[in-house]
């Protein structure tokens, strides 16, 4: 295989081209990475020296003959440089995918190295111009002293892609930190909302227990007062109404005796006397006159004297019974008031609990809104980071397309040179 130009008569053999290409190769490992730029520079300088020598010799040979002079265009980056382009872009794409997958900024060193090699466009141009002007003997030393740069350092699109990668590298950590803060805010808001739920439940339980205890206590007190009222009424009936009824009956019987009605007859019942029980409890016996049908005057006088006292006793029993009824009514009222007060107290406890629950629900709503806001902000931040990664991926795709175009142009130039 040979590369040449028919009109100029210049020809470079396959072995010589292989020797020149092999000059740019270096051993594997870290040393290969460090010497990559120097090897490429030496290979370019050697190639330029060989081409310069052949062109100069041929120019001197054809100067006197008057042949037409053919000027060659500046060659495009060689295959080794294009391979370096492809490797660089592939490495960027691989590291970008790893960064997007892990969300961990681990490609800082690679980006820094690339930026250090490509950040100074003027330095690269100056080094290249100086390398062209130097002679063939000084080319290796000049290439060795030149900064380690790739041949495509003049590409502004690639510089823009590197700048985008560096900016993205700086933003990833801040994106992760912000997303972490927003996630923690959402978590704290969720925990606060859960605490408010527990507080509402505790308030409801406390209100239920306190209201139930108060209502039970007041209901029991009211029931006891009602029982006292019933007991007072029962006692009044037993101690007042029954004696009053007996006195009324005896008083009626005595009144009938005074009128001569139901007078005892000895021939029928063989009763010869009448016993009368006084207010003091003393029983007085009166003999019945056997000689006539009416009571004696003494007997009638005694009965007439005791009638007002019996009537007074009957009235007093009635009054005491009325007093007992009033007392029972007061006890009944106390019982009703206790029960009503218990219900009122329970309602107050329920109202206070409802107020506390309302305040807790308001705080819960605020916490839920804060959680939703934090989640929305985190989602927006994640979407922005996703768009940034997509932009970086587009830049990498553009760089790959540019490398492919360079390869196509180089292939076209090589084809033209063969023909």
Curated annotation (Swiss-Prot):
Region (Disordered) location: 60-91, 338-402
GO cellular component labels: extracellular region
Any one Pfam family match given in the protein's UniProt record, by short name: IpaC_SipC
Protein location: Secreted
Composition bias, Basic and acidic residues: 71-91, 380-392
Keywords, ordered alphabetically: Secreted, Virulence
Main location group: secreted
Family per similarity comment: Belongs to the SctB/SipC family.
Protein name: Effector protein BipC
Source organism of the structure: Burkholderia pseudomallei (strain 668)
Native organism taxonomy: Bacteria, Pseudomonadati, Pseudomonadota, Betaproteobacteria, Burkholderiales
């Amino acid at each position: 295989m040979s590369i040449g130009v028919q009109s100029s008569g210049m020809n470079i053999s396959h072995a010589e081209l292989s020797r020149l290409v092999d000059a740019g190769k270096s051993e594997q490992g870290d040393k290969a990475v460090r010497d990559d730029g120097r090897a490429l520079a030496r290979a370019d300088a050697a190639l330029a020296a060989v081409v310069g020598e052949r062109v100069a010799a041929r120019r001197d040979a054809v100067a006197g003959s008057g042949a037409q002079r053919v000027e060659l265009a500046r060659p495009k980056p060689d295959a080794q440089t294009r391979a370096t382009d492809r490797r660089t872009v592939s490495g960027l794409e691989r590291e970008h995918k790893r960064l997007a997958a892990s969300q961990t900024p681990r490609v800082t060193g690679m980006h820094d190295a690339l930026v250090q090699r490509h950040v100074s466009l003027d330095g690269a141009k100056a080094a290249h111009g100086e390398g062209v002007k130097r002679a063939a003997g000084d080319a290796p030393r000049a290439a060795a002293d030149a900064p380690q740069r790739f041949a495509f350092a003049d590409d502004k699109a690639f510089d823009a892609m590197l700048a985008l990668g560096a900016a993205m590298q700086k933003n990833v950590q801040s994106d992760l930190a912000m997303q972490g803060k927003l996630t923690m805010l959402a978590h704290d808001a969720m925990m606060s909302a859960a605490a408010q739920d527990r507080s509402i439940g505790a308030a409801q339980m406390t209100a239920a227990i306190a209201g139930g205890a108060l209502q039970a206590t007041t209901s029991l007190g009211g029931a006891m007062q009602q029982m006292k009222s019933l007991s007072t009424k029962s006692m009044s009936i037993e101690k007042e109404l029954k004696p009053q009824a007996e006195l009324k009956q005896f008083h009626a019987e005595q009144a009938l005796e005074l009128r001569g009605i139901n007078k005892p007859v000895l021939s029928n019942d063989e009763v010869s006397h009448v016993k009368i029980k006084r207010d003091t409890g003393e029983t007085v016996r009166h003999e019945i006159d056997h000689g006539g049908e009416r009571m004696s005057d003494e007997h009638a006088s005694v009965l007439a004297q005791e009638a007002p006292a019996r009537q007074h006793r009957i009235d007093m029993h009635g009054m005491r019974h009325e007093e007992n009824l009033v007392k029972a009514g007061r006890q009944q009222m106390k019982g009703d008031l206790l029960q009503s007060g218990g219900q009122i107290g329970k309602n107050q406890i329920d109202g206070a609990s409802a107020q506390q629950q309302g305040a807790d629900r308001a705080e819960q709503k605020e916490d839920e809104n804060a959680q939703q806001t934090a989640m929305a902000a985190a989602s927006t931040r994640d979407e922005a980071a996703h768009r940034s990664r997509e932009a970086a991926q587009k830049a990498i795709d553009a760089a790959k397309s540019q490398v492919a175009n360079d390869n196509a142009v180089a292939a076209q130039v090589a084809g033209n040179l063969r023909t």
